């Protein structure tokens, strides 16, 4: 392969043809087998444990298969343990639904199903004055559906809210969590009977259909970009969420009540003298998104996409590919090699990295630590505060993709006398801004498609 590249560069030099070479194997985007998982794009994952206080507790978390490194261990007191609807406790009737009890058993290993175009679930909670605050749908298979949530008043059902769910494109180019939960914040609605009506595009299996009194960050999985837009051409409004549900202060977790107990973890074990009361322990850790460069040969040119925020990791990637060509091909045989190429962006995003907390403090002026709970949909402080943090998160992702990744690539290229040639856009949910992103390149380019929808972007 290097001999072929050498021949191309030498011939181009002899014929005075300017050459550009992609920054790594494949056209999208920046990765290879030399990138270690700890140098790759990563996301924040978590595990949860419920404990009762009043003394020292020894908590051992199962070791995650995708574990890279611990981040933070946070604890908060569950002053108001809000119930979820359970098939064993509450009265549930359905139409067009199979094995509904498995969807309301709290077990992600069991499934029920929606078996036809239209279906409905009606619930009469056993708890008097049940207050519905959230819905969370965990699907086991792809789903595209529309939901209408209703409460019974004066003998008739009236709509509280409606929403859609789309988990149909499962490839990790559209997010590291293909079947990410669909989480919806519901205006606080007290009632004795609720109905959810559904229009579904195809049969699907559901792990959990959670109707709960517990508040949730609306569309949190989408807001942390674990699941991105499901078509090649996202529009402006697709990354703007208009849910304005607010919860009473005593229903959410206060920042003041979150305790950082990271010093108490050793590997997978937390030993902590737990104060009185019921507590939730959240162990957060980094995991690889698993996204690789493409198209590339497995076992040869394919490997993890490099961290978008870490310039040292980017330099390692650059030196391992571009640097190797420079070392192997004599300077006189590559005089017309002018550009390093970055193609259209098709590799989703990371939402965590080694310097996350320090960067956040220096650029946004506050400590993000308590708000890490919002990655799991836990409302911290208020809906507004939680959403503002997640906006800052996405702002950081966009800024660093532009300035640290493309800006970093440009600086590396300039040191070797190259320019950067960039296609300043991406498909399926680009985690940045085209103008800001392209502004870090020396040259930008477009393309024209004769068919299909990929060219619309």
Positions of PLM-derived features:
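Disordered, acidic Ser/Thr/Pro-rich linker "stalks" and the adjacent N-terminal cap
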Residues: 59-129, 140-146, 162-176, 212-264
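Aromatic-lined substrate-binding rim segments of carbohydrate-active enzymes
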Residues: 1-16, 268-275, 281-282, 409-410, ...
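Aromatic-lined carbohydrate-recognition surfaces of secreted/lumenal glycan-active proteins
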Residues: 20-30, 341-344, 398-431
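Hydrophobic or amphipathic alpha-helical targeting/insertion segments
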Residues: 2-57, 142, 185-216
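Trp- and acidic/polar-enriched beta-sheet ligand-binding modules for extracellular glycan
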Residues: 141-212
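Carboxylate/His-rich catalytic cores and anion/metal-binding grooves
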Residues: 146, 337-370, 419, 435-442
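Acidic, His- and aromatic-enriched active-site or binding-groove loops in soluble protein domains
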Residues: 3-10, 34-81, 215-220, 224-244, ...
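The substrate-binding groove and active-site-proximal loops of carbohydrate-active enzymes
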Residues: 1-3, 33, 37, 172-175, ...
């Amino acid at each position: 392969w290097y001999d072929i590249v050498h021949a191309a560069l030498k011939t181009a030099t002899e014929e005075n043809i300017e050459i550009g070479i992609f920054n790594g194997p494949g056209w999208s985007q920046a990765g290879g087998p030399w990138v270690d998982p700890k140098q790759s794009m990563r996301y924040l994952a978590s595990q949860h444990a419920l404990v009762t206080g009043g003394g020292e507790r020894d908590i051992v978390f199962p070791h995650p298969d995708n574990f890279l490194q611990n981040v933070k261990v946070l604890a908060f007191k569950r002053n108001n343990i809000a119930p979820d609807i359970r098939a064993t406790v509450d009265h549930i009737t359905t139409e067009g639904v199979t094995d509904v009890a498995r969807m309301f058993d709290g077990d992600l290993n069991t499934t029920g199903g929606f078996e036809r175009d239209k279906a409905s679930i009606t619930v009469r909670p056993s708890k008097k004055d049940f207050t519905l605050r959230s819905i969370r749908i965990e699907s086991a298979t792809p789903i595209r559906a529309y939901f209408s949530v209703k409460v019974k008043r004066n003998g008739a059902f009236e709509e509280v809210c409606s929403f859609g769910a789309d988990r149909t494109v499962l490839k990790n180019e559209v997010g590291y969590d293909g079947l990410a939960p669909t989480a919806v914040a519901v205006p606080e609605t007290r009632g004795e009977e609720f109905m959810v009506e559904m229009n579904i595009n195809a049969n699907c299996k559901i792990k959990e259909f959670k109707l709960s009194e517990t508040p949730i960050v609306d569309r949190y999985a989408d807001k942390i970009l674990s699941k991105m837009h499901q078509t090649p051409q996202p529009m402006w409004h697709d990354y703007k969420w208009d849910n304005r549900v607010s919860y009473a202060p005593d229903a959410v977790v206060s920042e003041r009540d979150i305790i950082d107990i990271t010093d108490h973890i050793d590997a997978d074990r937390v030993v902590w003298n737990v104060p009185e009361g019921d507590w939730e322990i959240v162990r957060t850790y980094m995991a690889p998104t698993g996204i690789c460069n493409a198209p590339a040969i497995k076992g040869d040119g394919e490997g993890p996409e490099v961290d978008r925020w870490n310039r040292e990791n980017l330099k390692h990637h650059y030196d391992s590919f571009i640097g190797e060509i420079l070392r192997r091909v004599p300077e006189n045989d590559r005089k017309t090699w002018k550009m390093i190429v970055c193609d259209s962006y098709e590799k989703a995003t990371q939402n965590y990295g080694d310097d996350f907390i320090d960067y956040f403090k220096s650029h946004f002026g506050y400590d993000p630590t308590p708000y890490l709970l919002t990655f799991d949909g836990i409302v911290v402080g208020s809906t507004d505060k939680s959403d503002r943090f997640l906006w800052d998160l996405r702002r950081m992702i966009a800024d660093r993709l532009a300035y640290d990744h493309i800006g970093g690539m440009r600086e590396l290229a300039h040191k070797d006398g190259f320019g950067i040639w960039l296609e300043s856009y991406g498909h399926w949910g680009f985690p940045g801004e085209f103008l800001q992103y392209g502004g870090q390149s020396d040259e930008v380019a477009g393309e024209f498609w004769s068919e299909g929808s990929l060219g619309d972007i």
